[in-house]
């Protein structure tokens, strides 16, 4: 409880120090915009713990995603296709995330005119807490290692999401962690969603 109070105080201080451009937990409930060169993402809370994300790309068609708690993708829609990831377990039981938590969830991937070829697995491991900066704003994030595997157990993708629970959004992804090829791809600015 004390850590949550301190975290909220830090977020409030960040918002006060940098004016209206910093979005805090309360403002996030009405939506916000994250941007990096070539990508603009509008985050809006939705029913059932979902977060709707409207992505606009400089060189691609727009895309809409629905992410459970702003972290786990369950639906994607664009002019290039549609994809639903149906969890075979209760995602609500995974949240709120805490440092040291680990979980494994199976999904069935569905897309139009394509039969599922088996299940996929998402392994989550909350490695710890960090601070991440977006412009002049600082946010407390959880480093969440996400590993996607096919039914045979082969790794399809792995990265560490820098997830801000107060915003319900991953602010960046860290790839090839702990190697000489380590890189971070993340948003650079945040602002409230214009009403």
Regions found by a protein language model. Give the residues of each.
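N-terminal signal peptide c-region/cleavage motif recognized by signal peptidases
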Residues: 13-16
């Amino acid at each position: 409880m004390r850590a949550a109070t301190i975290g909220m105080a830090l977020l409030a201080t960040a918002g006060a120090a940098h004016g209206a451009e910093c979005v805090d937990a309360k403002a996030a409930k009405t939506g916000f915009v994250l941007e990096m060169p070539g990508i603009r993402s509008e985050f809006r809370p939705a029913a059932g713990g979902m977060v709707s994300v409207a992505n606009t790309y400089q060189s691609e068609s727009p895309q809409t995603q629905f992410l459970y708690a702003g972290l786990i993708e369950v639906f994607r829609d664009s002019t290039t296709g549609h994809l639903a990831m149906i969890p075979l377990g209760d995602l609500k039981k995974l949240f709120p995330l805490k440092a040291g938590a680990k979980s494994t969830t199976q999904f069935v991937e569905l897309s139009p005119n394509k039969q599922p070829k088996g299940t996929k697995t998402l392994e989550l491991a909350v490695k710890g807490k960090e601070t991440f900066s977006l412009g002049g704003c600082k946010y407390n994030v959880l480093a969440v290692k996400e590993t996607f595997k096919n039914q045979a157990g082969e790794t399809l993708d792995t990265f560490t999401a820098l997830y801000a629970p107060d915003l319900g959004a991953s602010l960046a992804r860290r790839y090839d962690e702990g190697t000489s090829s380590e890189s971070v791809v993340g948003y650079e600015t945040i602002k409230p969603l214009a009403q």
